């Protein structure tokens, strides 16, 4: 079987298991396993089949078994686990993916390369490093770093490729969490390996280990574990229902609600990462080109050197030029995005992932470390001068780990003179701030915040799935819908009003009306709705063009918060969209009472009156709009049309002539032609109709648009029999 056939057959078996068609699933799995030489798996399946056959026989005999449902769940779970391992076993034989090459090479690893043995090597690193520092010229440092990094690499790869931990593996992995000597970076890397392994294949022992890791004292570790849990559940959304002990542990973790709040934060960070492509596009197409266009303006400005140097007074010309260029708004927008945790550096660093360091998958997950051999090679063991400044910058929480490595490698490849010049662009005030102990301490504290750590880790993952050489070998969760609150195991944890509202509002702010609406509806069903929620639900429905439902939501908002101008205005709009012009007019008049000179309100109130054929009243609104807004062409168009259908032809032509002298559209020539024809100016009418046909792009569209006005023309006294003749004049 090829890869596609294996995946399809596996998915078919899983679909049967999800539908609880266990007997069929076992039969299909038996056929699936005939293609594999894995006898232990065949034995496991045979045992599961035998147990199920006995269970069915007892049921047929009417034997009451209070443990029947529990046993059924266990057999179904075992069948699913066998299917998982069978899939991997078959793929190992045909797939060229890195993961399967690792699995095929696992047998070559010496047996002493277990977790506990590797742990001892890693634990010895801090002491060995301290000894190296005492030696002249850090003698032996290169060999020590190489041994440490290779050991961490073996632990990462062997953990990732091990799809089914034994009890011994689980106990040894717990030993890593309990160790006080293991370097935190190594534990972080191991946590990522556990997550990657779970993405490939569900393993209860690994998931249980992540639940332990969430309570680890180190923030780097517990935040990685939290993200790992989110990823595991996104990859296997229904799987936890088969393991009551795991769902019970999740509930226990959330006893005080803190786990749910943290997981909800991860949820938002994952959703926010899905906005990265939009931000990247904005950076490439708007902000960077705008900055390039304004380089000369900013460079040629007077920088006020004649001012008293003692005065900290900025030249107002700078701000004016900055704001008038439009760059100010764009940079403020990007600053706001950065402050909320958006990934604003992806476009900058995407091109800097071609260094040899990034060819190895595990390096994408290694926390940034100035003592990593690749960094020491470029900057030395104890950075000084410019490198010390760079080191301070890298301690901040502004860049994710992957980007910090990219920045270092890029700086290392820049000649020293240019590097010095770049860093010299920082003012002495900036440098003093960095060197100032209290301020650098504040930067470190910011970098150590749980939300900053988890957000930067999500950015690391985003880069791995989008930029790594082997990205096509992985399922990219960032391309899929992320809806953690819908996962059954998280229902009691995340489906709480105070958490759902944050997700709903995120989708609302990012203009995802369908996703926001689903959550607002859920909040309404939980009886947690206020006027604000009904307003937002209405707005989402309006964006989805579900106007009648939007009206229902807005009316409820109006009951809870009466006469709110925003609600009234949107009610008017929705009624107008469903062509209930009488109701729309009623609400426009309410808005008018609050905002008597709102241009849009005047125009749409007049439009509703025109649709209701109350032309005299409509004209009063359009005249008022024309009075308060100079050269208002849309008011002229409305006056022209209302005057025409109301028999005021001279007034109609007066306004159409004003339009034709300004910025006419095809419809303006058409309507002016109607007026000219009705006033007996046949030649002028034909001329105007010809211009309309030209503007419409041909006779076909012109005749279609003309046909829509035919009834109105006849009502105004144009003979229906003359219409074909006029068409031939055009």
What is each of the regions a protein language model found here?
Residues 7, 224, 498, 532, ...:
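Start-of-helix register in tetratricopeptide repeats
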Residues 34, 522-525, 555-559, 589-593, ...:
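Conserved structural position within tetratricopeptide repeats
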Residues 366-561:
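Alpha-solenoid helical-repeat scaffolds
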Residues 698-730:
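Terminal, low-structured helical/coil segments at or just beyond the last alpha-helical repeat
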